[in-house]
């Protein structure tokens, strides 16, 4: 019985990985070991930064909503108080939607916010 080597499969794996390393500087694009290390690192950063991007977007939305509350309603209420008022009045709107309403159509944001704040007892 002849000995079977994985030469063809190994070459195929290496070729696939090296094709993803194109455009990198130095040995990272030419040498397999250093390129493979760089590829693993790049994948790790890609995963980490996808999570980080979501967190940054959430903070941006909260900042926009908070700014809209201060500017259009002329109150110094914080975002978390506003959200608790939304929950008390059973108005379910997510952060992204509130932020987009504030940016694109600020008058409708103030019209949306005023009845909620009045129903909870805050004088505007």
Swiss-Prot record:
HAMAP family: Ribosomal_bL20 (MF_00382). GO terms for cellular component: chloroplast; ribonucleoprotein complex; ribosome. One of its GO terms (biological process) is translation. Belongs to the bacterial ribosomal protein bL20 family. The keyword Transit peptide does not apply. Binds directly to 23S ribosomal RNA and is necessary for the in vitro assembly process of the 50S ribosomal subunit. It is not involved in the protein synthesizing functions of that subunit. It holds the Pfam family Ribosomal_L20. Keywords: Chloroplast, Plastid, Ribonucleoprotein, Ribosomal protein, RNA-binding, rRNA-binding. The keyword Calcium does not apply. PANTHER family: 39S RIBOSOMAL PROTEIN L20 (PTHR10986). This is Large ribosomal subunit protein bL20c. InterPro entries: Ribosomal_bL20, RIBOSOMAL_L20_CS, Ribosomal_protein_bL20_C. It is found in: Plastid, Chloroplast. SUPFAM superfamilies: Ribosomal protein L20. NCBIfam families: rplT_bact. GO terms for molecular function: rRNA binding; structural constituent of ribosome.
């Amino acid at each position: 019985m002849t000995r079977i080597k994985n030469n063809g499969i190994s070459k195929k794996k290496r070729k696939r990985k090296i094709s993803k390393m194109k455009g990198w500087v130095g040995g990272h694009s030419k040498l397999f070991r250093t390129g493979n290390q760089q590829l693993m690192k790049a994948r790790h950063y890609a995963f980490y930064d996808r999570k980080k991007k979501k967190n940054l977007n959430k903070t941006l939305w909260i900042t926009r909503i908070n700014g809209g509350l201060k500017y259009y309603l002329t109150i110094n209420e914080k975002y978390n108080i506003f959200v608790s008022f939304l929950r008390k009045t059973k108005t379910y709107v997510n952060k992204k939607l509130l932020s987009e309403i504030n940016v694109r159509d600020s008058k409708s944001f103030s019209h949306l916010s005023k009845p909620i704040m009045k129903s909870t007892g805050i004088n505007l």
